[in-house]
Amino acid sequence: MRRIVTAFILSLLLIACGEAPLKEYSLEVVAEYPHDVESYTQGLFFQDGQLYESTGLRGKSTFRKVDLQTGKALERLDFDKKYFVEGSVMWKDNLYILTWDTKTAFIYDANTLEYKSTWKYPREGWGITTDGKHLIASDGSANIYFLDENFAQQRKILV
């Protein structure tokens, strides 16, 4: 009898914990823009009216300032074949670019795209962005890392 009562209570709890209906969203395509089919996009951001893209392929990684209307690169950085470029972001007048498996980060001048420095990055570089106070990076794990401009970890969160 005790098992029956326990099973009954559990079934009532399961019914009470039913899933909420899924919210549905719709979308509308308002514009389409050309894109270089040779670029394998890893990072993409739009800043101050300009589109920027980091592309990663073994031996063909680039960072590009892109003309939105034509899809053509207005400016371009080509990386050594050993680097597989991933995420990129501009913050505090710097352009930060992460590489995937070589665990390297590059810093360029955000205005001129002139090289500034290379940093050894402690993990795989995947995505990177900023909240205006920190660089925020992912490495493919369940962690998001908040970093200062020298890539020193300030905190991390589990997602």
Where are these regions (language model features)?
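Short loop/turn segments that connect beta-strands within beta-propeller blades
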Residues: 66-71, 109-113, 148-152
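C-terminal motif of bacterial Sec signal peptides marking the signal peptidase cleavage site
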Residues: 13-16
